[in-house]
Amino acid sequence: MRMIDIIEKKRDGHTLTTEEINFFIDGYVKGDIPDYQASSLAMAIYFQDMNDDERAALTMAMVNSGDMIDLSDIKGVKVDKHSTGGVGDTTTLVLAPLVAAVDVPVAKMSGRGLGHTGGTIDKLEAIDGFHVEIDEATFVKLVNENKVAVVGQSGNLTPADKKLYALRDVTGTVNSIPLIASSIMSKKIAAGADAIVLDVKTGSGAFMKTLEDAEALAHAMVRIGNNVGRNTMAIISDMNQPLGRAIGNALELQEAIDTLKGQGPKDLTELVLTLGSQMVVLANKAETLEEARALLIEAINSGAALEKFKTFIKNQGGDETVIDHPERLPQAQYQIEYKAKKSGYVTELVSNDIGVASMMLGAGRLTKEDDIDLAVGIVLNKKIGDKVEEGESLLTIHSNRQDVDDVVKKLDSSITIADHVVSPTLIHKIITE
C-alpha cells in the first residue's frame, strides 16, 4: 500500500477503506509517513469529507494508536460527558456528584485549562489539599465505593490525535467536521467510556459559531459513538453569553456548590439537568429523560448531591468543610463594581471577550507553564435579557490588583445595552442519531 494512492483516492472523492485509514495513522505515528503527505490527506478530507464508516474507522485508528484506559473493574455503565468548551462552563463540577448521587458511576479524566479559565482540575485545586494524582487501583476503588472520582490525564492516550491536531493547526485544516469529530471521540473512547454525552456549544463564544455547523458536528460525533458500540447522545447549547454568572476558578467552584444546593443560576441548573438526564438514561438508571430529570431534582432537594460532593472532595484529600464555609476558598483582595453607563436591557455579553478579561486578571493560562490565580475572575450581576439602570452594577471584578483599567477597557467593548429585550435560547436541540 502506498500513501500517495490513498491521498489521490480521497482527493478524487472516493471512500477510504478501514485498512487504508489504519495504514495512514499507523505510519504517521511511527514517523514513516512525513508531515507533507499527512497534511495533503488532511486537506483532501477537508474538501471531500468522509462518510460515517470512514469517520468511525479514523476514530478507532486513533484510539488504537496508544493506550486505552481499562475501567472494566468499575461496576455499571461508565458515562462520560464532553463539552466543546465555553466560558464559565462549570457543568462538570455539578454533574459529576449529581449523577453519582443517583448511582451513575463517574470515572472522570480531566485536564488543566488553557485560555479563558482553568480546566476542571484547576477549579478543584482551589480546594485546599485536593489532588488528582491517584493511581489506577485507587481510582477504580473510589468510583466503586463513592461513584465518583477525578484523575489527571496520564498515559499515552491517542498519540495520533496529538500529532494530527498539531499538524492541522498549522495547515488550515482545523475546521473539518470529520477531523474534529474523530479527534474528540477518540479521546473519550480511549479514556474508557461505555457511553458518551456531548455538549456541543454554538454562538459567539463557541468553536462552532453557527447552529448549522454545531448540528453537523453533533450528528457526526453521535454517529461515530453509536457505530463503534458506545451509546452517544448530544445537546446543542448556546454560548452567546457565558454560562452561569461566574468566570474564574474559585468563583466557579462556589457557583457549583450553590447549584448543588438548588440555589444556582437558572441557565447552569437547566443545562446540568438536561445533560444529567441523558447520562442517567444511558447508564440504564431510568427509562425516560423525564424520569431521569425527576431523580436528579430529588437528589438536589434531598441534599444527596451536595453530600456526594463532600465525600468526593474528602476522598481526594480536599478540605470538604469549604462546602459549608465557602469563605475558606481563595478570595481576591479587591472587588470592583463595573457599572452600566446607561439604562436599558442587556442585549450582548461577548463570551470570548469576558473570558479574555478574566484571563487578564490571572484566571487563565496563555501557555502551559503559566501559574493561575485561583481567586480572581468576574461575576456577572446581569445577563442577556435583564433590565439595568444607569449606574447599576453589571458585573463584579474580583482582582488581586487595584488597577484594572486594561480589564475595564476590554469589558467596555463586550457589553451592549439597548432599549429592546432579547430572549436568549439555552438549549437549541437534542441529538440522538
From Swiss-Prot:
Phosphate binds at residues 81-83, 92, 108-110, 120. Its EC number is 2.4.2.2. One of its GO terms (biological process) is pyrimidine nucleobase metabolic process. InterPro entries: Glycosyl_Trfase_fam3, Glycosyl_Trfase_fam3_N_dom, Glycosyl_Trfase_fam3_N_dom_sf, Nuc_phospho_transferase, PYNP-like_C_sf, PYNP_C, Pyrmidine_PPas_bac/euk, Pyrmidine_PPase_CS. It comes from the Bacteria. This is Pyrimidine-nucleoside phosphorylase. It holds the Pfam family Glycos_transf_3. The lineage of its organism: Bacteria, Bacillati, Bacillota, Bacilli, Bacillales. It catalyses: uridine + phosphate = alpha-D-ribose 1-phosphate + uracil; thymidine + phosphate = 2-deoxy-alpha-D-ribose 1-phosphate + thymine; 2'-deoxyuridine + phosphate = 2-deoxy-alpha-D-ribose 1-phosphate + uracil. Catalyzes phosphorolysis of the pyrimidine nucleosides uridine, thymidine and 2'-deoxyuridine with the formation of the corresponding pyrimidine base and ribose-1-phosphate. Keywords: Glycosyltransferase, Metal-binding, Potassium, Transferase. It is an enzyme of class 2 (transferase). GO terms for cellular component: cytosol. Substrate binds at residues 168, 187. Its cofactor is K(+). K(+) binds at residues 88, 90, 243, 246, 255. Signal peptide: none annotated. Homodimer. Belongs to the thymidine/pyrimidine-nucleoside phosphorylase family. Binds 1 K(+) ion per subunit.
